[in-house]
């Protein structure tokens, strides 16, 4: 099973690159984050599941036609697909900027949610995506 994950920062502007990536590497699953649209492009040989709420978030998961997976849940920050052998979470995790009121608590809620999801699964869970881990200021796109 070959899985590719990429924060595309806008799926429409990267459509040609995504298509080349799919043709070159022939992945079974492609997980994209920060898609910024609810209308993901279609690529030959793949079906797509997409969820987006605003211009800053969104996830899309492409499954090759030879892969059988069942969509189970999504919001603008995650999309879950269940397979026979595992559960896949494509995640664009909320940013946890301590300088913005409410961001830390929102991130903690997400962290609690993902821990419960993993604990309650009977199958292995694969989490891929942009985990937005900002351990130090150097990890930030907007350092002080």
In which residue ranges do the predicted regions lie?
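N-terminal, active-site-proximal structural segment of metallo-dependent hydrolase catalytic domains
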Residues: 1-43, 59
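Active-site-proximal beta-strand elements of phosphoester/diester hydrolases
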Residues: 1-10, 85-97, 128
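Short, flexible loop segments at the rims of nucleotide/cofactor-binding pockets, characterized by
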Residues: 5-12, 71, 103-108
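Short catalytic/ligand-binding loop motif for oxyanion handling, primarily in non-cytosolic enzymes
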Residues: 12, 38-41, 96-100, 134-143
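Short amphipathic alpha-helices and their capping/turn segments at secondary-structure boundaries
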Residues: 20-23, 77-84, 112-123
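Metal-dependent phosphoesterases centered on the DNase I-like endonuclease/exonuclease/phosphatase
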Residues: 29, 110-144
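Structured beta-strand-rich core segments of catalytic domains in phosphoester-bond hydrolases
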Residues: 35-99
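Surface-exposed cleft-lining segments at the edges of enzyme active sites
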Residues: 92-114, 141-144
